Design a protein with these regions (language model features):
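Fe-S-dependent hydro-lyases/dehydratases of central metabolism
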Residues: 1-180
């Protein structure tokens, strides 16, 4: 087995058998996908009293669901970066931050071109929080719905989720708590 070039061998690492996650990193963060994973898969559960988070038209691709483009300063992800003292010039893109689930779930449904029929006249990742009727970013609504214990669904039109096999389109939706 190759040990790699000299530069590779000079990289300083912890001598551990398990990766030591850097809690301060905004690029790579330990994902929650395997936390509390049951030994056996859970069966299907009935979804009751769910609210739609988005009602989308036709041709909403994985690029709409999980954008790879620039991160807006005035967004839930921008707020997350401000909390972590990251300057806007260093936000980079969603594509470069795929190793951080906190960034990626905030970016889910945040494509600047996505149109949610629940929030007419808006573009770019907004929804309407019910029963208040307040228009807000999708992630912010999810936080409120989680506090209330509200099940969420997304209603997609023809060819919803088609496109490149971007894993974050599925993972981000799951992390937001969308049931169907």
């Amino acid at each position: 087995i190759s040990e790699g070039p000299k530069q590779w061998q000079e990289i300083k690492t912890d001598n551990t058998s398990i990766y030591n996650w850097d809690a301060k990193s905004t690029y790579v963060k330990k994902p929650p996908f395997f936390d509390n994973l049951p030994d056996e898969p859970e069966g299907f559960k009935e979804i009751k009293d769910a609210r739609p988070l988005l009602i989308l038209g036709d041709m909403v691709t994985t690029d709409h669901i999980s954008p790879a483009g620039n991160i807006e300063k005035e967004s839930p992800t921008g707020n997350y970066f401000m909390e972590h003292q990251i300057l806007p010039k260093n936000y980079n893109s969603y594509g470069s931050r795929r190793g951080n689930h906190e960034v990626m779930m905030r970016g889910t449904f945040a494509n600047i071109r996505i149109k949610n029929e629940m929030a007419p006249g808006t573009e770019g990742g907004f929804t309407k929080l019910y029963p208040e009727g307040k228009v807000m970013p999708v992630y912010d609504a999810v936080v409120e719905y989680k506090k209330r214990g509200t099940n969420l669904i997304v209603i997609g039109g023809k060819e919803y989720g088609t496109g490149s096999s971007r894993d974050w389109a599925a993972k981000g939706t799951k992390l937001l708590g969308v049931k169907a």
